[in-house]
Curated annotation (Swiss-Prot):
InterPro entries: Restrct_endonuc-II-like (IPR011335), tRNA_endonuc-like_dom_sf (IPR011856), UPF0102_YraN-like (IPR003509)
Entry's family note: Belongs to the UPF0102 family.
Organism for this UniProt entry: Caulobacter vibrioides (strain NA1000 / CB15N)
This protein's name: UPF0102 protein CCNA_00142
Sections of the chain in a coiled coil: none
Pfam families (UniProt xref): UPF0102 (PF02021)
Superkingdom of the source species: Bacteria
Gene Ontology MF terms: nucleic acid binding
């Protein structure tokens, strides 16, 4: 495959990912969450969305695939662990977050379907 084709596919995937994150943020806002950040880089990994509702700090992974089921299956154990470490690091090092209950959520998306939000998606993973 030519380098230009790979690059354009990567660019398209990033656009789809950003759009999915914006839709996920709007979905969470409609459910009463306050969005604290998008694509937050930590030394231990990136967090797609950071949201708060009450005393809960939701660290949200957003996955869009062709089906909701594929999106639900897209986060592998190594990625969950990286997300958990990044969440712990961010909560410990960002002012105002230390006293919140950190929870790892997943928002699964597919074209033509409403987002599916799974609070505590991996049972305290």
């Amino acid at each position: 495959m030519a380098a230009g084709v790979r690059q354009s596919r990567g660019t398209a995937a990033r656009k789809v990912g950003r759009r999915a994150e914006v839709i996920a943020a709007l979905w969470l806002m409609a459910k009463g969450y306050r969005i604290l950040g998008f694509r937050l880089a930590t030394p231990l990994g990136e967090i797609d969305l950071l949201a708060q509702r009450g005393k809960v700090l939701a660290v949200v992974e957003v996955k869009q695939r062709t089906t909701i089921e594929d999106a639900l299956d897209a986060v592998k154990p190594t990625q969950r662990e990286r997300l958990r470490r990044a969440a712990t690091h961010l909560a410990a090092h960002r002012a105002g977050l230390r006293d919140l209950l950190v929870r790892l959520d997943l928002i699964a998306m597919a074209p033509g379907r409403p987002p599916r939000h799974l609070p505590d998606a991996w049972g305290g993973a």
